[in-house]
Amino acid sequence: MPDHDNWNEHWDRYAAAASQNPAQQMRHALIAKLLQNGSEGRPAQILDIGSGQGDLMVKLRPLLPQAKLLGFELSPSGVKISQEKVPEATFFVADLFQPPAELQAYAGWATDAVCSEVLEHVDSPAAFLRAARPYLADGARLIVTVPGGPMSDFDRHIGHRQHFTRDLISSVLQEAGFKVECVYLSGFPFFNLYRCVVIARGKKLASDVDAGQAGFSAWLANWVMMVFRGLFRLNLMDSRFGWQVVAVARKIG
């Protein structure tokens, strides 16, 4: 397995940095808003496909206290961290192309599903979504986030195969058996600016994260992240310039 596909190593190395990442926090806020707006007062059963280290569940738990939360994640390290963070949720170590027998109990289970920052890491995004499809109820809503805009050296370092456009993610969802309701190009202008910083830093960003920071460097990094967290509140939900792609689709029965 290539290093950039070793998800145990990924979460062991990057778990803390991912939790503090203002871009991840921005995405989770967008997802939470979409889930809340479409809940229609019914108890939700939410499946996080590629649940990582559970940060989305941490965000959703207080906002949707009646919802049942389920996560599928390839990495045992990610599942362990997730279970510690959100003991009320259920997590499985799962390769959807070779699913464990326990997942059979969740066939048609999800009223809502999320697949956030996963599809850029797989060779066939449509095949991956088709493998996840059996765990969604007919008519279930799927929220997908994927990166748009240019790819950085750090993106390649952590295993990005491709970035997406509005048309490309729509095509992937349709091929996987979903009806696309809308695709937003979010994040303009300040997420784009943040991404330009990441692109400029390149592979050195991986060294920064691996080495850790102390003293003035740590203070500066935290200050920059705090500034972007504030600026991200001013981002547009949709414009033709946004580099954060957010799609909402429905499972076709």
Predicted feature residues:
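Conserved N-terminal segment of class I S-adenosyl-L-methionine
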Residues: 1-108, 112, 116, 126-129, ...
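Acceptor-substrate binding/catalytic loop of class I
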Residues: 19-23, 153-172
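A generic structural signal for alpha->beta connector loops
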Residues: 66, 88, 139, 177-180
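A short His-aromatic
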Residues: 117-121
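A short glycine-rich, Lys/Arg-flanked "PGG" loop and its adjoining helix->strand segment in the class I
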Residues: 126-138
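Conserved beta-strand signature within the Rossmann-like core of class I S-adenosyl-L-methionine
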Residues: 140-146
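Short aromatic-enriched loop/helix-cap "lid" or pocket-rim segments at secondary-structure transitions
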Residues: 155-158, 192-198
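Conserved S-adenosyl-L-methionine
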Residues: 178-189
